[in-house]
Design a protein with these regions (language model features):
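Short, Lys/Arg-rich, polar N-terminal cytosolic tail immediately upstream
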Residues: 8-37
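Hydrophobic transmembrane alpha-helices
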Residues: 31-93
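Short helix-perturbing small/polar motifs within transmembrane alpha-helices
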Residues: 41-50, 128-170
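Hydrophobic alpha-helical transmembrane segments
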Residues: 43-47, 84, 88, 100-108, ...
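Alpha-helical transmembrane segments of multipass membrane proteins
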Residues: 49-57, 90, 114, 133, ...
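Interfacial aromatic-anchored transmembrane helix boundaries in multi-pass membrane proteins
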Residues: 110-137
Length: 225
C-alpha cells in the first residue's frame, strides 16, 4: 500500500539513444530506399563501360564474318547465337550503376562509337539495332521497378536485348523465311540471356569483390533494392 493512500504510477523506462543498437540498425534499414537519381559518377562509369563495350563491338565486327558464316551454315538462323557480343553493354552498365536508363544509355553510346569507328553494318545495323537492344535490356529492369538487380532480372534483360536484335534483323530481312527468322530470334534470345545476362551478372559480382565498386550499391556488401 503506497504511503498516504496515494497510488504511484510507474514511469516507463526511458531508453537512451544507442541502448539497443541492433534494433536501431534494423529500423534504419527499413526506411532506406533505393536512390534512382543519377550522380556524376554514375554517368562517368556508365560512359566508360559504353566506350569499352563499343571498342569490343568494333573488334568483333572485324572478326565475326567467318564465325557467323560457319554457324549459319549449320542451320540458317543459328548465327544469332553469336549476337551477345553486341548485347552486353546495357545489362552490364545497368547492374553496376543501378539507375533507370543506364542500359539504354550504355548500349546506345556503345553502338554509336562502334559506328563512328567504322564497320560493315552502317547506321541501321549499328545504331538503330543498338537502340532496340538497349530498350530491350532496359525493359528487363523496368518490369521490376528498378528495384531488382539479381541474376533473374539481368538474365531477362539480356534475353530482351536479344529480342531487340532479332526483331531488327527479322524486319530488315523480309526475304527470310519464317522458320529462319524464328530460329534467328530464338538463338538471339538464348545468346543474350546467357552471355549478356548471366555472364555479365557474374562479371559484376567478381568486379565488386575487388572493391572498385564501393561507391555504388552494387559494390556494397548489404544493399537494399
Amino acid at each position: 500500500m503506497p504511503a498516504h493512500g496515494r497510488l504511484s504510477i510507474p514511469v516507463p523506462c526511458q531508453r537512451e539513444k544507442g541502448t539497443y543498437p541492433f534494433f536501431e540498425e534494423k529500423q534504419s534499414s527499413v526506411v532506406r530506399k533505393h536512390n534512382n537519381k543519377w550522380r556524376v559518377v554514375d554517368i562517368v562509369v556508365a560512359a566508360i563501360i559504353a566506350v569499352a563495350s563499343g571498342v569490343i563491338f568494333w573488334g568483333w565486327d572485324i572478326v565475326c564474318t567467318a564465325p557467323l558464316a560457319l554457324f549459319g551454315a549449320v542451320t540458317p538462323g543459328f548465327e544469332g547465337l553469336l549476337n551477345a557480343f553486341w548485347l552486353f553493354a546495357g545489362p552490364l552498365a545497368a547492374i553496376i550503376v543501378r539507375k533507370p536508363g543506364a542500359a539504354l544509355f550504355a548500349e546506345t553510346l556503345a553502338a554509336a562509337l562502334e559506328l563512328t569507328m567504322g564497320n560493315q553494318w552502317g547506321v541501321g545495323g549499328s545504331l538503330i539495332v543498338g537502340i532496340m537492344q538497349g530498350f530491350g535490356a532496359e525493359i528487363g529492369f523496368a518490369v521490376f521497378a528498378y528495384r531488382k538487380w539479381d541474376l533473374l532480372s539481368t538474365t531477362i534483360a539480356g534475353a530482351l536485348a536479344g529480342i531487340g536484335c532479332g526483331l531488327y534483323y527479322w524486319i530488315t530481312n523480309p526475304a527470310w523465311s519464317t522458320v529462319r527468322a524464328s530460329i534467328y530470334l530464338g538463338t538471339s534470345i538464348i545468346s543474350g540471356a546467357v552471355l549478356a545476362g548471366m555472364v555479365m551478372y557474374f562479371l559484376q559480382q567478381a568486379i565488386a569483390k575487388t572493391g572498385v565498386l564501393d561507391r555504388f550499391e552494387s559494390g556494397r556488401a548489404q544493399v537494399l533494392v
